[in-house]
Swiss-Prot record:
Gene that encodes the chain: Ybey
Record carries keyword Glycoprotein: no
UniProt similarity note: Belongs to the endoribonuclease YbeY family.
Entry keyword annotation includes Nuclease: yes
Source organism: Mus musculus
Protein name: Endoribonuclease YbeY
Superkingdom assignment: Eukaryota
InterPro entries: MetalPrtase_cat_dom_sf_prd, YbeY, YbeY_CS
Matching Pfam families: YbeY
Enzyme superclass (EC): hydrolase
Residues the entry annotates as binding Zn(2+): H118, H122, H128
Molecular function (Gene Ontology), one example: metalloendopeptidase activity
GO CC annotation, single: mitochondrion
Length: 164
């Protein structure tokens, strides 16, 4: 199904074609290509507002995920009952925040891909609220990014690396 990437900010230039290409590969690796996915790029002010409203945290952040299928357990796939259910949800990328925290040696597009992959894992029920949950999420991210690296030649590391 479709992957929609919307750029709703003007602070950071976004190259949507490489991000789309990589995220299409990530969706294939995860086996969720038949589901719709939205990726929305926003600035610090917008991501902070969303973070305040939905998480009670009045600070900008790198990624927020809003799943269409609530209560999925880590690694479960949604079970659509109608054509409208073929939707994973939306990932908001705080692209200004991501750029501000991007190391000089890192490729910004690669960091966006890693961050979006992290968000996609959240849409599939993975969390990092406890060490055990984090380990599952880290392993999933690592597996996906290693496979993606085989296609792209990049050496991508999970966003959740080092959380515990």
């Amino acid at each position: 199904m479709s992957l929609v990437i919307k750029n709703l900010q003007r602070v950071v230039p976004i190259r949507r074609v490489p991000l789309r290409r990589k995220m299409d590969l990530v969706r294939s690796i995860l086996g969720v290509k038949k589901f719709d996915l939205g990726i929305i790029c926003v600035d610090n002010k917008t991501i902070q507002n969303i973070n305040r409203i939905y998480r009670n945290k009045n600070v900008p952040t790198d990624v927020l995920s809003f799943s269409f299928h609530e209560n999925l357990k880590a690694g479960e796939f949604p079970q659509p009952h109608s054509p409208d259910d073929y939707n994973l949800g939306d990932i908001f990328l705080g692209v200004e925040y991501i750029l501000q925290h991007c190391r000089e040696s890192e490729d910004y597009c690669d960091v966006l891909t890693v961050t979006a992959t992290h968000g996609l894992c959240h849409l599939l029920g993975f969390t990092h609220s406890s060490k055990a949950e984090w380990q599952k999420m880290y392993n999933q991210e690592k597996l996906v990014l290693e496979e993606l690296s085989r296609y792209t030649g990049a050496r991508l590391q999970p966003l959740s690396r080092g959380l515990y």
